[in-house]
């Protein structure tokens, strides 16, 4: 067990809650102590849902452990059925509740409810949130759609002439990163291809909708971490093919359109020719040339991290210097992607390892989760959020998908704006000592009048740590290896170098000083090092 102040994923029962909360007519009875009810806040506070999750907790306390906790669970299940009248019920235990070993599935089925009751057995101490969501969706699909499965060996009937092809959208859940808007975007894209959506699951689906998943011609796997297992089962039992491409980014969206068109047997030429997105033109415009070869570090769930790496490299001209994920189940896919960009993959759920890697690589932009936002802020690096887990500001009121052509526009704005702000910050820092721009200067539009006198503080000689006015990304290894000391005037001169290359300039200067036996780095040393490495 590891004590930490941050986790990328919650326990697996939180994943089950995400599925249940996204659906309609489904209720989740969770054998859990009172302390586990914190999970409600994830949906009401962070996602800003206007109603509580459809979850009933047994909320046993320490005094109940000497009694019949099984009876406590059965009473909670009966009360939930009578109060909410769900179409189906799932039952399980939280990480703490599983230690009691009361068998919620067997207890609930013994109550004889006239609705489907699906037991969700989640290994709380071996698996995490996304796996829990995937397992819950898989068990629901098996239990509700399974009775309508064709006989073994039976072939899938051909679609009648003139009938529009249909598909299911699999994977969107509550608390997902832009899942709500991705559904709208992909539904519209499929509509342009002449394809109807049969069911979106689990988001917005009822148990009756899950039961008719087999009616569709194929499945669109929007988020493989959640829908991959269910899609594989539907392919095996109902002979429904499913998509492999996740349409995040312009190139991936075009590939997705071609793949879907092939599965549905439709012509995608008109849709591809009419595709409208501003990202390609914006990224090729003169104003965007400064994006070329920007060093970017990417971390998130596997789906969004791999997609972000492709966009960064192929569509924006960034240089991917780091790629990682907390999704251990998709380690193989991430390693293959990392090999493509010639970087070492980082597969971990320890945010301290991620922070150390960011500090080591000195990126100019970090793309990650809410934690990477904090890490980048501490290190003084621009950051954009690309993946769950996220905080409340990443559930915007506006339409902001990540998928499709409009999603590409949103991604361009989201990723580039932090760099724009960084450029402005650099200009302000560069000219802050100029006689026209210092704090005591009169505004230029007010003529040549005299400004109010301002007390001017003369900088005294100070240690390098005090002289520095902007956060530096300096790894522990580099700091330990450097024996040279920075003179105050050299530190001041270093601040005139743009912040997004300042770390590299510092490292090169210290390396030059160490190789040439320079004990104190002066302004002359700084420029000698610049000339040396410019050859």
UniProtKB/Swiss-Prot annotation:
Catalyzed reaction equations: chlorophyllide a + oxidized 2[4Fe-4S]-[ferredoxin] + 2 ADP + 2 phosphate = protochlorophyllide a + reduced 2[4Fe-4S]-[ferredoxin] + 2 ATP + 2 H2O
Cofactor note: Binds 1 [4Fe-4S] cluster per heterodimer. The cluster is bound at the heterodimer interface by residues from both subunits.
Active site, renumbered: 287 (proton donor)
GO BP annotations listed: light-independent bacteriochlorophyll biosynthetic process; photosynthesis, dark reaction
EC number(s) on file: 1.3.7.7
Cofactors that this protein relies on: [4Fe-4S] cluster
Binding site for substrate: 422-423
SUPFAM superfamilies membership: Helical backbone' metal receptor
Annotated metabolic or biological route of this protein: Porphyrin-containing compound metabolism; bacteriochlorophyll biosynthesis (light-independent)
Amino-acid positions noted as binding [4Fe-4S] cluster in the UniProt annotation, renumbered to this chain: 36
Key words of the record: 4Fe-4S, ATP-binding, Bacteriochlorophyll biosynthesis, Chlorophyll biosynthesis, Iron, Iron-sulfur, Metal-binding, Nucleotide-binding, Oxidoreductase, Photosynthesis
Gene Ontology molecular function: 4 iron, 4 sulfur cluster binding; ATP binding; metal ion binding; oxidoreductase activity, acting on iron-sulfur proteins as donors; oxidoreductase activity, acting on the CH-CH group of donors, iron-sulfur protein as acceptor
Family annotation (InterPro entries): ChlB/BchB/BchZ (IPR050152), LI-POR_suB-like_C (IPR013580), Nase/OxRdtase_comp1 (IPR000510), P-CP_red_C (IPR042298), Protochl_reductB (IPR005969), Protochlorophyllide_Rdtase (IPR016209)
Family listed: Belongs to the ChlB/BchB/BchZ family.
Subunit structure: Protochlorophyllide reductase is composed of three subunits; BchL, BchN and BchB. Forms a heterotetramer of two BchB and two BchN subunits.
HAMAP family: ChlB_BchB (MF_00353)
Function description: Component of the dark-operative protochlorophyllide reductase (DPOR) that uses Mg-ATP and reduced ferredoxin to reduce ring D of protochlorophyllide (Pchlide) to form chlorophyllide a (Chlide). This reaction is light-independent. The NB-protein (BchN-BchB) is the catalytic component of the complex.
The protein, known as: Light-independent protochlorophyllide reductase subunit B
Source organism per UniProt: Rhodopseudomonas palustris (strain BisB5)
Gene it is expressed from: bchB
